[in-house]
Amino acid sequence: MAKIIGIDLGTTNSVVAVMEGGEPKVIPNEEGGRTTPSVVGFTKTGERLVGQVAKRQAITNPENTIFSIKRFMGRRYNEVNEEMKMVPYKVQQAGDHVAVLAQGKEYSPAEISAYILQKLKKAAEDYLGETVTEAVITVPAYFNDAQRQATKDAGKIAGLDVKRIINEPTAAALAYGLDKKKDETIAVYDFGGGTFDISILEVGEGVIEVKSTNGDTHLGGDNIDQRIVEWLIDEFKKKEGLDLRAKGNEMALQRLRDGAERAKIELSTTMETEINLPFITADASGPKHLVERLTRSKLEEMVRDLVDRSIEPCRQALKDAGIDASKIDEVVLVGGQTRMPRIQQVVKEFFGREPHRGVNPDEVVAIGAAIQGGVLKGEVKDLLLLDVTPLTLSIETLGGVATPMIPRNTTIPTKKTETFSTAADNQNSVEIHVLQGERPMAGQNRTLGKFHLTGLPPAPRGVPQIEVTFDIDANGILNVTAKDNATGKDQKITITSSSGLSKEEVERMAKEADAHAAEDKAKKEEIEARNQLDGMVYQIEKMLKENGDKISPSERGDVENALADSKKALETNDAKQMNAARERLTAASHKLAEAMYKQAAPGAGAPGAGPGPEAAGGAQQAQAEPKKDEGVIDAEYVDVDEKK
């Protein structure tokens, strides 16, 4: 039975896991790493790089290396002003939504994410030895409908049937609570690369119930890196009078980002670090080097407001759950950024207890996703997950008011029906405007979709009975139906286009991704064929130079012709042609190999020993001689006896 893999599609890193023998297991990628950088690079030659190899070339190719794409998933162009300032690649408008530009081609955020998912899918297939088509993918708890839908689209483009979208803190709680027998109330504090989430859950006896969730999708480790980058730029400007923000310094900025991230990581375990970036730029006086010392206390001072920003959502989540911080039994830290001592201290101060450090903050979410995959497959028994919708869902009513249908933190899946009426006499249609958010007015919330219910019979205002139903599935994705009770007419909308991609676009991108996977395979085959043929040409040329006089002129001509054909094949990009040339070269070089073998055979180099029968006779004679000379043998026996 095919497995359902669990994927943590992260802002900075991604992880894939699977249930094996009743236990969740993290699957290493092709390079052997348990985490895969969420980075996609596009080279000048048209090659697409994903993961560590893409991250390594980011400094020399910053404008075509896409990272932190999760921050753009399902977002409108007018929502990403701050995010755009933090990346060196071009982010542009595509309708209402966002696209990134690399090597002159436009990509949607879902497409870029799909390339990361494809790499994880392949790692799982290599590990399991079978095709993988189903996955559970995690998202930040505070992701809205559009962001969730974009994640599902990315899965589809990557060739995955996304069986469930689950919230990251909930996945972490699944991993934490798998073996818990007693009931506990836990808080999952998830500070990742691009988003922050807090969830309050009740865990125990096979039930994991989310009581409330809150967060900030504009707060993450990237923001902390950016603060260090800004500080480095300002310090460098003070000393050298050069502004590294100026156009043309893209490579320098990418080096600063790398240096900032390294320094931040080092300061989690040391009190001081040096950021040393030689030849960061140059002016008329020559090259300039950046060397700065950064202390842990200075970093904490720089990012104090960012860390403190995470506390208000915690306060709100506790309020929504109706419990006090003192009633929390355990605080589970998730996300690489929680390794920062200042964050651990703030969490300890707010919740009044030491945070739990028994889980790997980088891997726990993917492990939880794999467990959920096991639940869906029936591999994990007696485990019930009750998640919630993070944001209030409303419809617009008279006066531009947002009338709530499903309040935030409602357990999902759920269904809610309300009856509305018309606002004017003889109104023959109504517009259903679906909203997501916590603000009282429709215009202050996010539009998920609009549709019309038409063909209403003429009637005074307030008379028609229009039944509106909101239905949220287990993925947190919404269906809305409006029905006129008088005529029985109804109209339905599935909020699926909110990611900015139509069904046709998703299918087209999926086909392109498949084609690209085939291209990648062909490229790999070409490289392997080239390497094998190139190595063989080198060997045969060397053999011919050293032993060419030991074969006949016609045989030598065959080898030389095969070598010439092989060199021509190496100039092509055709793996079949190169493999065929290698086979011809192998066949032609057999005589040369035989000549070398004969030369290397024992006794072949003795004087007078030629390839003819005389040599064979000589060998027989040599073997017979010791038998004639018994004295030699006797003498040996005497010698041995004397030694004894």
Swiss-Prot record:
Residues 632-644 have a biased composition (Acidic residues). Residues 598-644 are annotated as: Disordered. One of its GO terms (molecular function) is ATP-dependent protein folding chaperone. Induction: By stress conditions e.g. heat shock. It comes from the Bacteria. The modification Phosphothreonine is found at residue 195. Residues 612-624 have a biased composition (Low complexity). Keywords: ATP-binding, Chaperone, Nucleotide-binding, Phosphoprotein, Stress response. Belongs to the heat shock protein 70 family. Acts as a chaperone. PANTHER family: HEAT SHOCK PROTEIN 70KDA (PTHR19375). This is Chaperone protein DnaK. The lineage of its organism: Bacteria, Pseudomonadati, Acidobacteriota, Terriglobia, Terriglobales. The gene is dnaK.
